[in-house]
């Protein structure tokens, strides 16, 4: 008999091993079909190409946006500064994201931000209004009479806060957060190094009220906020990175061109990659550790499945 | 008669047209500032402003060169400006109809007052004081429109929409209607002014005088009317009466300017504003308006020598009266002037309180406010920056672009971004990190200078609850701070801010600060 002989016991053990392995590791990794990483990091290339590639590596935009969806694209439009100074999100990234949303079948894409300087100035000089409109999105100024008070039942410090109505679940299907990686003195670090602004901080753009009060106890407040309002996809713009004098900046000397796009659905993992890109250890940022501790995502990058790629 | 009815319709059309243009131009004074016509067109057409400001500031102000058009028009047609163009005059006509006030064309005993006002202003201008900010009719309407009428109107519109935003079924279509207009036609943020009531009261007072008789202001108080009367009292185009007049007195009774002499034949061309009402009301059709040889004008100015001298003395007397009122240092130190403003005395001498700068500022940073007595009676309604109500946008120099009189010098954006309006101070009793020993840094976050003017010290601190923590304590770097006030505006404390701006270190146009700083 040329057949290999397996006993009944060997068969049962082997089958059980495969079954347990499948459950533990996930079928994709075991059988090598369509691996969808948690985070993709694309370096080099144009901002638009890098953004597109980052989404392709994550399985494409239709992995996140379904046909007929109403999508909120939330870039950072906080400041009345020129394109390239790293205070606002790169308009090319915003435009590419909107284009991909429509390719995935989105019915409507809305773009807005609660700005720090005068809204029209910010929308215009950031280049985002023009870019988003050219891609077919609706660009709106947020209206002070359209905020709803939202409760945060698991909030440690933040119990209730006004949030922009259009960004609330029920009024939209998906929310795509596009922060710009930059220096910001507010988020505390364990090491005492200057803080960094990323996806969590960018969520403040859909808050209303006296937002300055969020600053006292920022680390707890922002995590409390994201226990209820979470982005479905976060895309970090690390193309022009403001190293000093953030979050507003204004000097080209403070900007470093890193030409990097980081994308993923795990808000904590994406921010952690952003922090790493800035040159810090992820758990140095206190709000990230806090978010990780409360189960909003994964801070340990060794356990986050990441695909990195460099475009030429 | 029918002939003049057509002309009267044309006159009313002209009045409505210029009133609308006035408001459209004023509304156009907003970010991003554009449009083919200067928004201060009416002020530039005002010869009273041009002449008296030039005298008071000892400079020929060419920005008022357009007012020559009005002077030439007046030399030919008399005070046609007052009857056909002046938006304040039109406002009175509308108010008169609503209030049913009567012409009382025979009440003429107070009409010389306006020459006293003009002479007083002239004498004061020679002594380098301009009182135009109180008396000029176009400035008056500009100020009332900016400070009261437009904010009132926008509030009404915005509130109506805001109500619909909370009604489930119609909220989305209502917002869809509203949002394309927001920031384009409807201001994004509601203009709010601390002292708008004082502006309104002044305006209501003048309107109330209309109850005495029509066009009271124009007949008896308006210095621009007086000046145009001087230019136009021998105008060739005039009212003439044919010999078939039966002296029914209707024209004289119904003259809203009281310009018809009691012989019904002669007209006071220093007062006639060519409204044409007399030609229409005349049952005999004997009144017409035409170019005619110069007729004798009845005592056009009603000014005796005693009144001349009295007016001049009043002009001299009022200047020290106003100039010797001052406010406390504390109030005026919190009253920052717009960037590019002339040194204070020159500034007050040039600023006519038209509120063009306030209007344009309300569409962007929103810090400029008409003051009341913060800078003295002398500075009433002059623009001051209230940094708790708004702040000076780092990328904006629009106020300097709209100033019609040059009280705010036209400065470039680069100049503005390094020119100090004042400086920021931390109130360490109120500022959150000093008071609660908690991080805050909203001011540092917003500080717009490329290298931050607000920095912070990290110090290990014992908190009220006994724990030890690193706290970021903010401070100001004087050499970088331009006093834009965004820190004061954005401070999350309720009421008084934990950081505030004063005029210390300010750099007015043509004047650099001498204060040396070390940091």
Annotated model-derived regions:
Chain A
Residues 2-312:
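N-terminal and secondary-structure boundary signal
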């Amino acid at each position: 008999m040329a057949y290999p002989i397996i006993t009944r016991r060997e068969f049962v053990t082997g089958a059980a091993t495969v079954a347990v392995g499948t459950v533990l590791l996930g079928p994709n990794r075991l059988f090598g079909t369509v691996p969808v990483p948690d985070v993709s990091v694309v370096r080099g290339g144009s901002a638009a190409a890098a953004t597109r590639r980052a989404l392709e590596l994550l399985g494409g935009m239709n992995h996140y946006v379904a046909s007929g969806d109403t999508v909120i694209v939330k870039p950072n439009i906080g400041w009345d500064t020129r394109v390239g100074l790293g205070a606002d999100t790169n308009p090319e990234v915003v435009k590419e994201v909107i284009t991909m949303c429509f390719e995935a079948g989105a019915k409507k894409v809305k773009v807005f931000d609660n700005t720090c300087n005068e809204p029209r100035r910010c929308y215009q000089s950031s280049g985002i209004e023009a870019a988003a409109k050219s891609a077919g999105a609706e660009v709106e100024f947020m209206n002070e009479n359209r905020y709803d008070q939202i409760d945060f039942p698991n909030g440690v410090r933040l119990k209730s806060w006004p949030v922009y109505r259009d960004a609330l679940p029920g009024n939209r299907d998906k929310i795509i957060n596009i922060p710009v990686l930059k220096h910001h003195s507010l988020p505390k670090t364990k090491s005492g190094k200057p803080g960094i602004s990323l996806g969590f901080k960018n969520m403040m753009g859909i808050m209303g009220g006296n937002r300055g009060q969020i600053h006292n106890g920022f680390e707890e407040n922002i995590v409390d906020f994201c226990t209820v309002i979470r982005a479905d996809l976060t895309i970090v713009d690390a193309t022009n990175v403001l190293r000093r004098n953030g979050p507003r900046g204004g000097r080209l000397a403070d900007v470093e061109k890193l030409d990097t796009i980081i994308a993923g659905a795990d808000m904590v993992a994406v921010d952690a990659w952003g922090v790493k890109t800035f040159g810090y250890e992820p758990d140095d940022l206190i709000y990230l550790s806090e978010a990780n501790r409360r189960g909003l995502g994964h801070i340990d990058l060794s356990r986050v499945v990441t695909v990195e790629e460099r475009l030429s | 008669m029918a002939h003049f009815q057509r002309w009267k319709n044309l006159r009313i059309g002209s009045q409505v047209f210029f009133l609308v243009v006035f408001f459209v131009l004023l509304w156009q004074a907003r970010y991003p500032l554009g449009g083919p016509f200067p928004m201060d067109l009416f002020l530039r057409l005002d010869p009273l402003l041009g002449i008296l400001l030039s005298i008071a500031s000892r400079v020929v102000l060419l920005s008022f060169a357009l007012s020559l058009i009005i002077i030439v028009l007046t030399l030919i047609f008399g005070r046609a400006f007052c009857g056909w163009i002046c938006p304040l005059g039109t406002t009175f006509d509308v108010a008169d109809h609503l209030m049913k006030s009567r012409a009382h064309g025979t009440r003429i005993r107070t009409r010389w007052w306006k020459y006293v006002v003009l002479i007083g202003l002239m004498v004061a201008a020679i002594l380098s004081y301009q009182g135009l900010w109180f008396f000029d009719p176009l400035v008056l309407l500009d100020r009332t429109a900016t400070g009261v009428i437009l904010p009132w109107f926008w509030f009404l519109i915005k509130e109506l929409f805001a109500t619909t935003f909370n009604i489930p079924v119609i909220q989305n279509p209502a917002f869809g209607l509203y949002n394309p207009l927001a920031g384009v036609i409807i201001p994004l943020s509601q203009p709010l002014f601390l002292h708008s009531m004082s502006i309104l009261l002044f305006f209501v007072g003048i309107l109330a005088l209309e109850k005495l008789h029509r066009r009271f202001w124009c007949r008896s108080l308006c210095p621009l009317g007086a000046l145009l009367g001087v230019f136009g009292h021998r105008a060739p185009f005039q009212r003439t009466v044919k010999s078939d007049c039966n002296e029914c007195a209707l024209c004289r009774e119904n003259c809203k300017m009281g310009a018809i002499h009691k012989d019904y034949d002669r007209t006071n061309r220093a007062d006639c504003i060519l409204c044409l009402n007399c030609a229409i009301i005349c049952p005999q059709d004997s009144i017409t308006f035409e170019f005619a040889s110069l007729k004798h004008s009845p005592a056009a100015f009603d000014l005796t020598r005693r009144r001349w001298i009295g007016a001049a003395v009043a002009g001299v007397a009022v200047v020290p009266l106003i100039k010797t009122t001052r406010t406390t240092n504390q109030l005026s130190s919190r009253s920052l002037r717009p960037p590019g403003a002339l040194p204070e005395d020159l500034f007050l001498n040039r600023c006519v309180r038209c509120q063009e700068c306030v209007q344009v500022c309300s569409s962007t940073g929103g810090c400029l406010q008409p003051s009341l007595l913060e800078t003295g009676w002398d500075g009433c309604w002059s623009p001051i920056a209230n940094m708790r109500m708004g702040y000076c946008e780092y990328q904006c120099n629009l106020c300097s672009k709209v100033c019609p009189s040059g009280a705010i010098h036209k400065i470039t954006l680069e100049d503005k971004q390094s020119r100090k309006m004042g400086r920021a101070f931390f109130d360490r009793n109120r500022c959150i990190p000093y008071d609660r020993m908690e991080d805050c840094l909203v001011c540092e976050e917003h500080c717009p200078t490329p290298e931050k003017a607000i920095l912070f010290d990290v110090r290990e601190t014992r908190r009220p609850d006994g724990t030890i923590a690193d706290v970021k304590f903010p401070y100001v770097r004087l050499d970088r701070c331009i006093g834009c006030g965004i820190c004061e505006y954005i401070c999350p404390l309720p009421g008084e801010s934990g950081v505030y701006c004063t005029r210390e270190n300010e750099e007015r146009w043509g004047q650099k600060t001498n204060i040396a700083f070390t940091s």
